[in-house]
Amino acid sequence: TTDRLDDLAAVPPADYLKIDVQGAELAIISNAKAKLAEAVLIQAEVRFLPLYDGEPGFGDLDRELRAQGFLFHDFAFLKRQALQTPSSARLRRRAFRQAVDGDAFFVRDLTNVGDMTDAQLWRLAVLAQAVVGSPNLALFALDALAARKAVPADAADGYLALLPPAMLREA
């Protein structure tokens, strides 16, 4: 038998969940509502072409995560393949456009940032940089914290100063 994640007392609530369980992501996430109630980031394997019978697709997982207050943000990676036709063998890999699977980042709904605590915004800023590699998302969280006066007004300036110059627009 399988236990629901919400029923496992030894598992604490999560700030960030990374999950890759060969097609069972939806079943696990839908049974982890309490554990994910304060989470700010989920990284889940998503599938666009099924590999397993009855496997949920990206849309199924997206619907569940939206119901739990998350929105798709970006892909950590996305694997593509050629559509198999008699002529497709003549194409280079970069011409393959059919999305197969990948890892997707879902973040707490940023249109409702007022519902997030300062602690959640802090965690989001850190995870945005350390896990997602998204300076834009990190700045979003820092600016929201600055608007609440939870960080110094120049916190974003300090963060921007740490980024490689190639990531910044010229002044």
Regions found by a protein language model. Give the residues of each.
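S-adenosyl-L-methionine
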Residues: 1-5
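Conserved acidic-Pro-Pro-aromatic motif
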Residues: 8, 12-141, 145-146
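Short, charge-rich amphipathic alpha-helical segments embedded
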Residues: 135, 139-170
